[in-house]
Amino acid sequence: MGCAFCASTIGGKVRDLRPSEMLGQLTAAAHDLGERIDGVVMMGIGEPLDNYENTVKFLHLVTSADGLNIGGRHISVSTSGIVPKIYELEKEDLAITLSISLHAANDTRRSALMPVNRKWSIDELLTAAKHYFDATGRRVSIEYTLIAGENDTPADAKELAALLRRYFARGDALHVNLIPVNPVKESGFSKGSRESVERFRENLEQSGITATVRRTLGPDINASCGQLRRASGRA
């Protein structure tokens, strides 16, 4: 999707995954772990709603009693903001969690970070997200990558809180996941200090927005989202 801070986008799109391939990832993980998989997060390399038909087939398969019988409440689907597909997803009777990759609180900054915003604005995106909540009753997750000097100041936190309150008056309607950016040589972005990340979270909480700093895994060995794929492509 061309997001400026993301390692996943550097290599470009190769092709869409088929439902059987998505299911294969789950069965392989279950085999390797020796235990049942009871939760799915569709996030990371690729845009699930840009592969809508295959994504939905996979979701119906894993939630079906004749499939893996994983409850919709244990499944999250992330999108960078393909607005028309959000309205389609709410009609699928899946009751899954919708995760919005937001990463900025105004259109100017978000369009610079995420090209998809030039087609569908923040207002269009959050209006669709609110509609999804109203239709399904499922809390919306807001993903916000913290980038030092770009979107991580106390003023940015206040702007984000004010934005979200305009669309989600109920405190239980959404939750913000804060994600310190993973360093990617090609992007030049860096993450702030642990103190600045915690201060951002506190500013959101003080404004009535529930927020959690997501635990990061793999950056010490370049194994975070998209990094291994990028390293493999360079090898």
Q: What positions do the PLM features span?
A:
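Residue-level detector of anion-binding/catalytic polar loops
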Residues: T210
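Radical SAM enzyme core and accessory elements
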Residues: T216-A235
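Canonical Radical SAM [4Fe-4S] cluster-binding loop centered on the CxxxCxxC motif
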Residues: M1-S20
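Gly/Ser/Thr-rich beta-alpha loop segments that engage phosphate groups in nucleotides
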Residues: A4, G46-P48, V83, D220, ...
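Short, surface-exposed helix-loop/turn micro-motifs enriched in polar/charged residues
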Residues: K13-V14, I37, N69, V213
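Short, surface-exposed helix/turn micro-motifs that flank interaction/cofactor sites
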Residues: A4-A7, N177, G226
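A structural preference for short, hydrophobic beta-strand core positions in alpha/beta folds
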Residues: L178, V213-R215
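Conserved AdoMet/S-adenosylmethionine-binding subsite of the radical SAM
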Residues: E21-S207
